[in-house]
Amino acid sequence: PYNFITRKDWQGSLARIYAFVQKEREQYKENLILLDNGDILQGQPTAYYYNYIDTVSPHLCAEMMNYMKYDAGNMGNHDVETGRAVFDRWINTCDFPVLGANIIDTSTGEPHLPPYKVMERDGVKIVILGMITPAIPAWLSENLWKGLRFDDMEETARKWMKIIREKENP
């Protein structure tokens, strides 16, 4: 793990993060929101195993995230790097929505993933909008994401914020 606040490596594992999250849940109860911002499918030997060796079982990363009770996830470029079969299997195993407002299915013109999730905590309506870098085509071979398009994040945010304000009224 990496601490983006201190910009230093963070010694630990998902087990350590789970212990931290459980402690926070004791304090904040149902008001705690647990999100993943992507790239869960790379960097660990266990992820590699379920990405490329055991391609039939439910993906361990999804199983761990389900156990930890994530509220929502987001696609990262390293998740796309594993290829459609792997990341679609991971998404389909998750008990929570994996978001991607700017990941467009080219056959339908619609988002490949749910664009956002609505939650209510302590009487406050919260909307989580998920997006991925649109640089995927410049970074990764098309065979990894064939049938998808990655739209501009700013334009996508404007579009979906209008829809969210009108439809969800957060």
What do the PLM-derived regions correspond to, one by one?
Residues 1-170:
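Acidic, metal/ion-coordinating pockets
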